[in-house]
């Protein structure tokens, strides 16, 4: 796997949004699933967080993920810091500005997936966002595997 930072360890991927209560939580959960399915636990580290974390993961997101047999009911949004991101090879933002997230001089790669916030959306709309995130996470892991 390609590392953009000076780290010689695993490739580190951070999934970040403002509240860490929806999109980034779904991306993190799907990425954990990909790690296990592809046997990459020793090669990839995952991180998720928000710049202004909410108190809880959005109920609609918990339900949408449960529909795919992934339980995130026990997840708690957390704050992401510049220090967290400094060692990340990839910072995947969900529609927020990377300039507010990524530290100055950071050597990694930012990708903004520009996804709609699922908070307050209908179950069908949340499912559509969830499915798009699942697809993008799978594509990211396909790409990472080709660089090994």
Where are these regions (language model features)?
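Phosphate-binding/catalytic loops
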Residues: 90, 96-148
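Polar low-complexity intrinsically disordered regions
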Residues: 1-8, 89, 99-100
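Alpha-helix C-terminal capping/helix-to-coil transition sites in glycosyltransferase folds
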Residues: 85-87
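Short, charged/polar low-complexity linear motifs in solvent-exposed/disordered segments
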Residues: 42-43, 90-92
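Conserved active-site segments centered on acidic
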Residues: 2-81
